[in-house]
Amino acid sequence: MNIYKPAGFWIRLGAALLDYIIVSVPLLLIYWLITGKDPNDSMFISLVVLLYSILLPMFWRGYLIGKRICGIRIVKKDGSQVSLLTMFLRVIVAGLVYCITFGLGLIASLILIAVREDKRTLHDLIAGTYVTYATPGEEELNADEEIRKSE
């Protein structure tokens, strides 16, 4: 496994906050303006955000809007493009682990990102992913360079 240019805690937090501001806040406001109901009770908004989190990285080379703005993206641990299964594991299964452990999984992720050289969190380990600063194609170039050095 060749982890290349891993992204740390603060940049990942910034990307998550940007995603919340850019995606969730407008959805909440639109829902509230249209229905007059409390948007926090809406399964529709939860479903839209869930689909956004799973599908967009598959079709946009590992980027979500916040990650793209911050220059980071999600890749498989071998540097390849994420798949539906990968994102399902990363979002749904890891989310269930965080819920079942009453937040202890989240604390474990914070510790992992602080102490691991590859900056992989619990949801990265579950899904076989990591978050990188590398642009699409850059990992392959780095892998080719590493092979040439070893020859």
From Swiss-Prot:
Example of a GO cellular component annotation carried by this entry: plasma membrane
Record keywords: Cell membrane, Membrane, Transmembrane, Transmembrane helix
Entry's localization field: Cell membrane
Pfam family name, one: RDD
Chief place where the protein resides: membrane
Residue stretches spanning the membrane: 14-34, 45-65, 91-111
Domain of life: Bacteria
Mode of membrane association: Multi-pass membrane protein
PANTHER family listed in its UniProt record: LMO1584 PROTEIN, PROLINE-RICH ANTIGEN HOMOLOG-RELATED
Name the record gives this protein: Uncharacterized protein YckC
